[in-house]
């Protein structure tokens, strides 16, 4: 078995992928708000992601990711990127118990997207997994 070469061969350069601008006037905004983070994804009607942002992606770390302000900035960032692809109207699907739910919806409206329907798609267990123990503060 020949010894492995340590980067002495020719370098393979990867061609940068070109993002083509889609023209999607109507989409869906999926807001997943957990106790630790908020993730906003804007998709086309088929479910393909057009743009996304999260509290951590916007620049917050640790416990600041779970704040409503971080969710607001994440939603504005995702909305701005989606508007570059022609999105004007969205239906909002909210999932999770986090603190950034309402703030993210409001900031989508403030960013210039017209919000059609708002639906809560939080999964409810039919006595599935055992929940985490109660906090004693």
UniProtKB/Swiss-Prot annotation:
PROSITE patterns: RIBOSOMAL_S11 (PS00054). GO terms for molecular function: rRNA binding; structural constituent of ribosome. Gene3D superfamilies: Ribosomal protein S11. Coiled coil: none annotated. GO terms for cellular component: ribonucleoprotein complex; ribosome. SUPFAM superfamilies: Translational machinery components (SSF53137). Residues 1-31, 117-137 are annotated as: Disordered. Keywords: Ribonucleoprotein, Ribosomal protein, RNA-binding, rRNA-binding. It comes from the Bacteria. One of its GO terms (biological process) is translation. InterPro entries: Ribosomal_uS11, Ribosomal_uS11_bac-type, Ribosomal_uS11_CS, Ribosomal_uS11_sf. Residues 12-21 have a biased composition (Basic residues). Located on the platform of the 30S subunit, it bridges several disparate RNA helices of the 16S rRNA. Forms part of the Shine-Dalgarno cleft in the 70S ribosome. Belongs to the universal ribosomal protein uS11 family. Part of the 30S ribosomal subunit. Interacts with proteins S7 and S18. Binds to IF-3. This is Small ribosomal subunit protein uS11. The lineage of its organism: Bacteria, Bacillati, Actinomycetota, Actinomycetes, Mycobacteriales.
